[in-house]
């Protein structure tokens, strides 16, 4: 029961930090633009939803490994990730180029 509360709190924490990035930072949504930012070494953090297709997930992880970028696996499906971003559509993956006022890169790197 304690572990469930901890994951709920960490999920809420990530959601709040993600909303702050959406307001004050720079980001890209979608598979093609995430790969483009990884190839150009512009991404600082990549977030992947829980139900991202395995081939896409492995390709993003490969490019992130080459670019030495942290990959965070979101504990929800693509609908939840889209809602956390404040969008009304599904988001499979997103890359954060500039976190703005948020410290999401530090907190996801520790986990």
From Swiss-Prot:
Gene Ontology CC entries for this record: cytosolic large ribosomal subunit
Taxonomy, superkingdom: Eukaryota
Listed InterPro entries: Ribosomal_eL30, Ribosomal_eL30-like, Ribosomal_eL30-like_sf, Ribosomal_eL30_CS, Ribosomal_eL8/eL30/eS12/Gad45
Molecular-function GO term, any one: RNA binding
Keyword line: Ribonucleoprotein, Ribosomal protein
SUPFAM superfamilies reported in the protein's UniProt record: L30e-like (SSF55315)
Name of a matching Pfam family: Ribosomal_L7Ae
Family, similarity comment: Belongs to the eukaryotic ribosomal protein eL30 family.
NCBIfam families: PRK01018.1
Protein name, UniProt field: Large ribosomal subunit protein eL30
Taxonomic classification: Eukaryota, Viridiplantae, Streptophyta, Embryophyta, Tracheophyta
Gene: RPL30
């Amino acid at each position: 029961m304690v572990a469930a509360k901890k994951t709920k709190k960490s999920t809420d924490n990530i959601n709040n930090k993600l909303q702050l990035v959406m307001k004050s930072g720079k980001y890209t949504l979608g598979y093609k633009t995430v790969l483009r930012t990884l190839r150009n070494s512009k991404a600082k953090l990549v977030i992947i939803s829980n139900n991202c297709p395995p081939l896409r997930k492995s390709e993003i992880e490969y490019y992130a490994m080459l670019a030495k970028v942290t990959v965070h696996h979101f504990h929800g499906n693509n609908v939840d990730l889209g809602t956390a971003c404040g969008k009304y559509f599904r988001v499979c993956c997103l890359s954060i180029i500039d976190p703005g006022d948020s410290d999401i890169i530090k907190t996801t790197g520790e986990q």
